[in-house]
Amino acid sequence: MRRLVSILFFTLMCVAAFSQNNAADSLYLDSIYRHLELEEYTITARVKEKDIIIPQTLSGAQLKKMNALSVADAIRYFSGVQIKDYGGVGGIKTVNIRSMGTNHMGVYYNGVQLGNAQNGQIDLGKYSLENIEEIQLYNGQKSDIWQSAREFGAAGSIYLTTRRPRFEAGKAFNVKAQMRAGSFALINPSLLFDIRLSETMSITANAELVSSDGKYPFRYRRVTPSGEVAYDTTAIRQNGDINAIRVEAALNHYYSNTGFWKLQLYHYNSERGVPGAIVNNVWRNGERLWDRNSFVQATWQDELFNRWSVRANMKYANDYTRYINNDDKLIRVENQYLQQEFYFTMAHKVRIFDWWDVSAAYDVQYNQLSMFLDAHRWTHWLSAATAINVKNYLRLQASVLGTFVNDAKSTNNGEAHQREAINAKPSTLAEQATNASAASIKWTPALFLSYRPTQLVDLRLNAFYKQSYRYPTFNDLYYTDMGNAYLKPELAKQHSVGLSFTQPFRIAGQKGSEFRINADYYYNRISDKIIAY
């Protein structure tokens, strides 16, 4: 009883003391309120919705953990892709999806497609992971309809996103120097630095050198028709060396939460040997290859009036290739090729309702190739797309793409020729005009669907149908003794139906992990397939 009385007495004393000081405290707090006004901030964010087309993604810590030199080494971890590797550090590395061919694959560097009008091959070994922040692979096309018209024309897409500079508080400079070495005299030094110019503007630059002699040992064994071993030895690979340098720089300006512009420069220069096949005791080939690839591209995007989004990209690329074959058993060959590319795109997206978006985009591109003849191509793309999301139960994405192509070439004597047809060789001028009109304009639709019958579990029915065209490259059309100016474009048709189940879970209390299983039926058919022989 005495303890209870003591507690009550102590409580009353505290209340009394607080009451006596309350008037003085009020005056003090009022003076603070009069002199201190906090700036008001409104923070808004949209709930991230699951993509209708779920990409395979490598980013952040995943890329850092990889013992890889180039983008091609990282893409090997994706399912459904095939890497064609011509061997060694200097070997050309190309990728295709679902065995459709490299030319049906679009590779995008910060949202702008990498091009090669000469042969359509994109060597992913030229692009280092040193400056890459994220790699995404889409089968079909990207989920977001806010994209360039050209992106709707790829049967599969790889998106390479470079690093965005991030600075710690009070720091205006980042630098990273790295030196790697390995077998076969591999040396790979690199330097990366970022400079903060202001709170919204920064510069980043990256340089890298790759050098290797490519002299790796391999087993060479020959067996006679009778089954006896003629010889079994270890040989050294020859003419597989490479010396390459890559330099990148970018100026970034993120002036709002939704708006930014970026100017980027890229340069790659290499000399390498082409080792060739080991047949009939031929240990060395005399082929050498020089590459110089440079481009400058600019990107601007912003969201206007909270409903209308605009994005524009511009690019100029200049590529040089020199090839020499010094094999003394063959006629000496030396070819030089110079490519130029001008590209512009503008894409608009309008949010009509919270569940309905529409977009439209226009792209134009000019390609020119100088060799034994001058080949020119004007290409225009026009797209319209829509996306519907009904309470996250039904998601629908539809698009249509128009592609307009006009090719021309001029020989060394300056005579100009229009590529009249991509059909069977016409016999009359009237047939030529008809075929030219039919060949230069193509329309291709695409439809993607995702249905989730219940919100209790993340079980989805996914389906898509898509058409895409692959136009012949300059080599396909005009290469000496092999080119055919009357080739039709390839028409690819894809459709797929499948189920996916996703279950998120925690590891050691951390969110972000999930278990996902897919079962898909997939079919593709390519008409008028172009095959080199």
Residue ranges and their predicted role:
Residues A72-Q113:
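Extracytoplasmic beta-strand/coil segments of soluble accessory domains associated
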Residues L129-K176:
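A beta-strand signature from Gram-negative outer-membrane beta-barrel systems
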Residues V358-L456, Y465, Y471:
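Signature of Gram-negative outer-membrane beta-barrel scaffolds
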Residues S26, G214-Y216, T234-R246, N252-R311, ...:
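Flexible loop and strand-edge segments within Gram-negative outer membrane beta-barrel domains
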Residues R311-K315, D319-T321, T454, L461-K466, ...:
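Membrane-embedded beta-barrel scaffold of Gram-negative outer-membrane proteins
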Residues T162, M179-A185, L209-D213, H267-E271, ...:
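Transmembrane beta-strands of outer-membrane beta-barrel pores
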Residues H35-M66:
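N-terminal periplasmic "start-of-domain" segments of outer-membrane beta-barrel proteins
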Residues I32-R34, P165-F173, E199-T200, S256-F260, ...:
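Short loop/turn motifs that connect adjacent beta-strands in outer-membrane beta-barrel proteins
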